[in-house]
Amino acid sequence: MLRKKVTLSCEECHSMNYSTNKSLMSVDRITVKKFCRKCNKHTMHKEEK
């Protein structure tokens, strides 16, 4: 199955902290709660275009 590399960015400060792989079959954007080093707290991170 093919996978695409995507970047996750913080919804508060918009820094791109994480990268992950995503299936090409999924159409939904990834949203995950992760730790942001810039904000120094756990925030929601969403997939960038």
From Swiss-Prot:
Q: Name one GO cellular component term.
A: ribonucleoprotein complex
Task: Keywords in alphabetical order, please.
Answer: Ribonucleoprotein, Ribosomal protein
Q: Does the keyword Ribosomal protein apply?
A: yes
Under Pfam families, the record lists:
Ribosomal_L33 (PF00471)
The cross-references to InterPro entries, in alphabetical order and at most eight, read: Ribosomal_bL33, Ribosomal_bL33_sf, Ribosomal_zn-bd
Q: Which residues form a coiled coil?
A: none
One of the entry's Gene Ontology molecular-function terms is: structural constituent of ribosome
- A Gene Ontology biological process annotation? translation
What superkingdom does the record give?
Bacteria
Please give the family membership noted in the entry: Belongs to the bacterial ribosomal protein bL33 family.
Family annotation (NCBIfam families)? PRK00504.1 (NF001764), rpmG_bact (TIGR01023)
**Protein name in UniProt:** Large ribosomal subunit protein bL33A
Q: Which organism is it from?
A: Mycoplasmopsis agalactiae (strain NCTC 10123 / CIP 59.7 / PG2)
Q: Report which gene this protein is encoded by.
A: rpmG1
